[in-house]
Structure formats: structure tokens, C-alpha cells
């Protein structure tokens, strides 16, 4: 079986800080857990991505407790990428180089925020020639202000991300579909986005 990398993007303690506002998909972490279990059981590569914000006051700034990875990511990954921009492909070490050196062509993405770092990483990964799977129900995001002064709720942002990506840039899949494609049998994932 060709290796398939799981990218867990920005699942850090600070993303659930109340300052981020209301979020969607309370099943996100359970679905990420199901993906991690499947990847570990198949001995497939796992990449954690950590956002090291350079913004003053950010909960994800290095040295802040919110910069730490979520406790469910306590196991050592095959690679830890750190970044301060939205795409994991512009972090350190070079993610594309690492994947290519291991003949990894397919990447499965999950994490936070659906419409920001996850979408950006999916777009760049696709542009670089990787076969991308985007596990929408294993991502979450937060309500966001619109330029016109209104608010866009997190569920709408997630749906728009899925429409933006699939089918031109990647395939949006469920947790179960990602696990089935991997060939693993893992615990039944939690369902839904809300």
C-alpha cells in the first residue's frame, strides 16, 4: 500500500479560547481521534502542524499556553511542521519536500480552522500536485465578521469551504470514507458538523 499522510492542522489549545467566538462541529475532535487511530493502526505517516502566531495577543503565540498542541496529540508524530502563515506548505521543515522524499502522493487533512489554515493548506497542496482529501467533519471553524459588518456563521463558512475545494482542488470526504480509503477498520466516527 502506498503511504498516505494524515495532516492534523493547528489543533492547539488556544483555538477553543472564548476570544475566538462561537465554533461549529463539536464532533471535530472525536473525528480527528478516529482518523489518528486508523493511521496508527496502519502505521501510516502522521504530521502535526502548529501555528506559531506572530500577532501580539494571539492565543497561538509561542510561549502562550494556547500554543501547545491539543492533549490528544501527545504521541510523537512522524513530522511536526511549525508555521506562522496559513498554509502548512510554507512552514518548517518543508512539508512538500518531506512528503516527496517518502513517495507520499496522497494527503488527508483535518484540523482547525476549516476556512483558513485547512483550506489554505489544501489549496497549496493541490497546486503542488498532491492528491488531497479534506475531511470536513474533522475540522471546525468559528463565526467570522464579514467586510460589510455582518457576521457569517461557522457552519456556512464550512459549507462554502467544501464548495470552494471540491471537486477542482481536492475531494471532500467523511471520516469513514477517509478510513475506508486507507483500508483500516477503526472505531465508528462521530457524525455531523453541528
Where are these regions (language model features)?
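Active-site-adjacent betaalpha module
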Residues: 2-5, 31-37, 41-42, 59-194
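N-terminal nucleotide-binding beta1-loop-alpha1 segment
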Residues: 7-11
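Short acidic, Gly/Ser-rich segments with clustered Asp/Glu that frequently serve as metal-coordination loops
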Residues: 13-18
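Short glycine-enriched, charge-decorated loop/helix-capping segments at active-site entrances
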Residues: 19-26, 57-60, 149-151
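A short alpha/beta connector and helix-capping loop motif
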Residues: 20-48
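Early exported N-terminus immediately downstream of N-terminal targeting peptides
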Residues: 43-46, 52-54, 58
